[in-house]
Amino acid sequence: DIYMNYYSYELESMHYEEVDPMTFYRDVFPDGELAPHREKDDYKTGEYSAIAMCVSNNLNPNEKHQIKRYTITDDFDNLDYILNSEDFCFMSPISYAGKNRTSNNARYLYALCIEIDNLKVNNKRIFKPEHETHRITYNKSEKCYIEHEYVGLHSLFENFGVYYPKPTYIVASGNGVHLYYIFEKAIPLYKNIAKTLEIYKRRLTKMLWNKKVTMSYKESDIQYESLYQGFRIPGTLTKVGLKTKNKRDDRATAHKIGDKVSIEYMNSFVAEKYKMSVIYKSNLTKAQAKDLYPEWYQRRVVEGKEKKRWYCKENLYTWWLNRITEETQVGHRYYCLM
């Protein structure tokens, strides 16, 4: 039998067939969400792109691995090129302003992704089978056949929708799995919103990394990752594949598991203190905004002016600060926050 990475084949056997990488990323970044392809110097404010990174085995003059950055626009041109790469390629489900993949440049989160490594597998020796599969392999060091039962992966499925939310996709990355929760609407990454997302992601990570799912369930072993973490791109080589260059067997694969999710659905699985703030990207087009808010459109879009701010003299600020410091009383009508 021909198989890719073990978890990919196990998901196939569970009737979760592999999805083409382009289809997967179109689900993550719906048509029209990313900026259209433009020439190098034709940047426009208010248009955002995804950013992919590829780490090569080739070393630069400083003896460090060469890293290439690719802007992913709405036509997915560079993504098509990356899928033919033999490098370690990763990307986060986030759109960015500009070319630098930093948290300050992050604009919208399209999916929450949780990585789980070292999934629990039960192994037992068996007599020589008629043929090897992803569940039966030959152990050269012990000179015997081993049957593998992927109990960690199956435990996840038994508890999706019960103890933790059901993901939209699972990417079999080789050594583990990536759970993608694709949002029905993208979430703007304002700093206060991003903070609640980080808290939620950390909590969900702890919930998923339990002893029934992974061998690395101890607190010191759990991999808590940033909201902005990039993940191996489906269709590209796994960690083993980077050595074997076997694109048929050793590549990451995406498998459709469930529907897109809402913040409300995700929040229903955690206590109040871990919940995300409910805010979504506006559905208004620029044309609609022009009709509804003509003055704003003229000032911000046509003239390119900055957001309006209220400025006051420093002595007025100091006067109010002194009043608050000296006069504020709990329960008083002027009890306030500045």
Question: Which residues make up each language-model segment?
Answer:
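Intrinsic-disorder-associated interaction segments
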Residues: 14-18, 72, 146-149, 197, ...
